[in-house]
């Protein structure tokens, strides 16, 4: 190629530059206000940075109550929309948002709506969403395998395992039932219930009594350990799951570890994020 001569019109033409691409990742969790939960999210953050070196990672909490509670403790956190707006202001063009929710319920729907809003009106060039833990049949099978792989090692033959999820009136509540059905095919003494869904401890207690079990390992089906796990599940209040199980004559052993503390579950979320990051280039 012959360089333009001095004084030629070619030398005055503006250079054509492709728009700069700036990628980022936003991790969206329900929220956490205790050390264990914060440690769990920090370890998840490290796994994400290992898989996507050089890609900035931000956080958002989807729970309004959790954000207010943290604000009262002078800990600033962002909603999904606020975090996305900050990333847009910082000139990010491609953003992958990963949900750390268990099911695609109402909060996940709000997250998707926030991302969609930032796609419109001269927003991001591309914005994608990574699915929650139980988003499809493949996820169900992998989650069932992870759940069974992480059952307590010290469990005895006469002991059941009961997992407590959050629960919702959203149609995605059926995700818990689908997971429970897969697990029961392998181990009929593993039960999955929720605090406020269609299958609660009221439904599980008679099954435990009829099954002849003597003890129960109680585990949260929640991303991180927070008040639901420490109080609603394993607390001393008469209405906690632990208290009710003990009142029915069953010995109860709580295990306070969230699903984001187990590699088998974390790998599913990371694979969803990988798909979301790859889709940014489509």
From Swiss-Prot:
Q: State its location(s).
A: Cytoplasm
What reaction is this protein's catalytic activity? Co-sirohydrochlorin + 2 H(+) = sirohydrochlorin + Co(2+); siroheme + 2 H(+) = sirohydrochlorin + Fe(2+)
- A Pfam family of the record is CbiK
Q: Where does the chain bind Co(2+)?
A: 166, 228
Choose one Gene Ontology CC annotation of this protein and give it: cytoplasm
GO MF, one annotated term: metal ion binding
Which cysteines pair up through disulfides? They are: none
Pathway membership of this protein?
Answer: Cofactor biosynthesis; adenosylcobalamin biosynthesis; cob(II)yrinate a,c-diamide from sirohydrochlorin (anaerobic route): step 1/10; Porphyrin-containing compound metabolism; siroheme biosynthesis; siroheme from sirohydrochlorin: step 1/1
Q: Tell me its EC number(s), please.
A: 4.99.1.3, 4.99.1.4
Key word Aminoacyl-tRNA synthetase present: no
Keyword annotations of the record: Cobalamin biosynthesis, Cobalt, Cytoplasm, Lyase, Metal-binding, Porphyrin biosynthesis
UniProt-listed GO biological process terms: anaerobic cobalamin biosynthetic process; siroheme biosynthetic process
Residues forming the catalytic site:
166 (proton acceptor)
Taxonomically, the superkingdom here is Bacteria
UniProt keyword Cytoplasm present: yes
Role, per record = Catalyzes the insertion of Co(2+) into sirohydrochlorin as part of the anaerobic pathway to cobalamin biosynthesis. To a lesser extent, is also able to insert Fe(2+) into sirohydrochlorin, yielding siroheme.
* Family from the record: Belongs to the CbiK family.
Miscellaneous comment as given in the Swiss-Prot or TrEMBL entry: Desulfovibrio vulgaris possesses two versions of CbiK encoded within the genome, one cytoplasmic (CbiKC) and one periplasmic (CbiKP).
* Protein name (database record): Sirohydrochlorin cobaltochelatase CbiKC
In its UniProt entry, the species of origin is given as Nitratidesulfovibrio vulgaris (strain ATCC 29579 / DSM 644 / CCUG 34227 / NCIMB 8303 / VKM B-1760 / Hildenborough)
